[in-house]
Amino acid sequence: MKKLLLCALLGIMSLSTTAKAPKVLTGIDMLERQNFKPLQGKRIGLITNPTGVNRYLKSTIDILHDAPNVQLVALYGPEHGVRGDIYAGAKVQDQKDEKTGLPIFSLYGKTRKATKEMLRGIDALVYDIQDIGSRSFTFISTMGLAMEAAAENGIELIVLDRPNPLGGLHVEGNVVEDDCVSFVSQFRIPYIYGLTCGELAKMLNAERMLANGVQCKLTVIKMKGWKRKMTFADTGLPWIASSPHIPQALTAWYYPTTGIVGELGYLSIGVGYTLPFQLFAASWIDAEELANAMIAQQMPGVTFRPIHLRPFYSTGKGEQLQGIQIHITNYKTVQLTPIQFVLMQEIARLYPEHSVMEHANQQRFSMFDKVCGSKQIRQRFMRRNQWSDIETYWNKDVKPFKILSKKYYLYR
């Protein structure tokens, strides 16, 4: 009997260990397996933040700093900083890293592209940041500008690849138009682009999407085990908050459902509450009424429930609000970005005296347009507050982009 119990216990322990082992090895994991061969003999600058960790949660900064055959000489901080303690939009200052003593150069302060002085003595830049798969999240812009700086200064850029938490099959939104190019829409890609950062880097380089068509010497350290159909949960990897308001991998799915409208600052989208990007709320909304209206739209892969809340900060701080919480029910069929436009449509119908576009601060329209990647979206929507008026325009580039981007797939 004791032997049977012991065997059962060992079996359970074995299953538990197996369940915890990640199915995917990221670029830094693979670089370690290669004994850092691509970095040998080079003076390295590292662009990273707290998401740059291996499968054991050891920081890429510490890994490269401690590796006997790697010469790490500088760090570069994107939005939120190398250690992740800077609020969204706040400038990052040049400083010294307390743990390693290495200089940290800001890529979100006076300049967003590394200068010649910042790159002096660097042979290769290494990029290791977990992105969230939406164009307006600025880390891919930092990567692209780093590619430009590398090209202009004759140095190599090495991307340590990581999963796209939205998978590799989702594509939504029009590509960025010339008058809306900005740090939140740096390249002519859709809002949801369905590529890993390594794949995106290859496409930006080969298709000459960087400024002035420059191309850099690019190396991508591929992952092992990642599939396009995977959600982040499928990878078995731990999630590190990619910004203060993306605390969980699941939040990456909700960011594109509310983030565009959130730029107007008119509705609470859960930032400042415990559900960032997962809701819409205001003091004048009837939660039951709006939830029923949104459910009646029968949008695929998503449903809604009434919610009552009092945000701790940001839009609606301290006010008693009502609204809807978004619940994604099918990650394969859901269309994420239309949710916010249908929401604005229903608000205009139910509460015309509070219709979003007519009552939001017009000074914020410019950022809304930049995040959309086109002024046409706002201008067409404002005519009747109908999603159907912009649906074709919003989706016009999806099929061509899917065809183009497939050329740069590193994973199936």
Residue ranges and their predicted role:
Residues 281-392:
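Conserved functional hotspot residues or short segments at active or partner-binding sites
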Residues 92-122, 134:
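Glycine-rich oxoanion-binding loops at beta->alpha junctions
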Residues 71-79, 160:
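Short internal beta-strands
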